[in-house]
């Protein structure tokens, strides 16, 4: 019986489409997208009708062109200053510090918090080569100096990186602005969770029970 594992004439590189390989490599440049995530995204996209694929890609390209960080809080928005920072009814006496825009939007869905946000655009992670200087911490200190908030709420993710980031920022605030109250969101969910994926009830309790 002929062995089907032998006499293979074509190399994998000859079979796998070059355009697909390049697309996957491009997707993998997006943070948190590895080989598996990129493949899942691309193959699911290819299952759609051609017109639907085109529609999705056009929407993504349009969003990339208009979206930018708010010049005040760094929340992703389609304006120079986001609706939250430009809303006079929002109290600048409360600044909620989050790692990413999606965390702020998760809290906004609760429709309870009436302060403003500050998006760090990441977290401190030495093993990944991310230091405090790579985040928007300096801008946060400037906002605290400018607005003299009553309270700064540290709502970084409940994981090792989030804790390290929160502790670093808390130390800075204590040294520079000793009169400012610093609170940390309570753990109403499992350590290692991401705020953007936490259910609304748990997130609301975490904000309410901050200390």
From Swiss-Prot:
UniProt source species: Aquifex aeolicus (strain VF5)
Keyword Lipoprotein among record annotations: no
Molecular-function GO terms, alphabetical: DNA binding; zinc ion binding
Residue ranges constituting the Toprim domain according to the UniProt record: 93-190
Any single GO BP term: recombinational repair
Name this polypeptide is given: Recombination protein RecR
Record function comment: May play a role in DNA repair. It seems to be involved in an RecBC-independent recombinational process of DNA repair. It may act with RecF and RecO.
Zinc finger (C4-type): 70-85
Family as reported in the entry's similarity comment: Belongs to the RecR family.
Pfam families in the cross-refs: RecR_ZnF (PF02132), Toprim_4 (PF13662)
Disulfide bonds: none
Underlying gene: recR
InterPro entries assigned to the protein according to its UniProt record, in alphabetical order: DNA_Rcmb_RecR, Rcmb_RecR, Rcmb_RecR_Znf, TOPRIM_dom, TOPRIM_RecR
PROSITE patterns named in the record: RECR, TOPRIM
Matches recorded under HAMAP family: RecR
Alphabetical UniProt keywords: DNA damage, DNA recombination, DNA repair, Metal-binding, Zinc, Zinc-finger
């Amino acid at each position: 019986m002929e062995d089907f594992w032998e006499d293979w004439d074509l190399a994998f590189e000859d079979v796998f489409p070059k355009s697909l390989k390049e697309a996957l490599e491009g997707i993998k440049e997006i943070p948190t997208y590895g080989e598996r995530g990129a493949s899942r995204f691309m193959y699911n996209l290819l299952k759609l009708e051609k017109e639907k694929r085109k529609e999705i890609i056009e929407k993504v390209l349009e969003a990339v062109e208009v979206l930018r960080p708010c010049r005040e809080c760094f929340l992703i928005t389609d304006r120079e200053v986001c609706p939250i920072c430009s809303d006079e009814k929002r109290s600048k006496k409360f600044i909620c510090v989050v790692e990413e825009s999606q965390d702020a939007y998760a809290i906004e869905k609760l429709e309870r918090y009436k302060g403003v946000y500050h998006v760090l655009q990441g977290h401190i992670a030495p093993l990944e080569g991310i230091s405090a200087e790579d985040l928007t911490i300096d801008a946060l200190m400037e906002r605290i100096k400018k607005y003299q908030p009553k309270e700064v709420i540290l709502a970084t993710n409940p994981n090792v990186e989030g804790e390290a980031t929160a502790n670093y920022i808390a130390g800075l605030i204590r040294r520079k602005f000793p009169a400012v109250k610093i609170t940390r969101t309570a753990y109403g969910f499992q350590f290692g969770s991401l705020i953007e994926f936490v259910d609304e009830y748990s997130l609301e309790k975490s904000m309410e029970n901050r200390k």
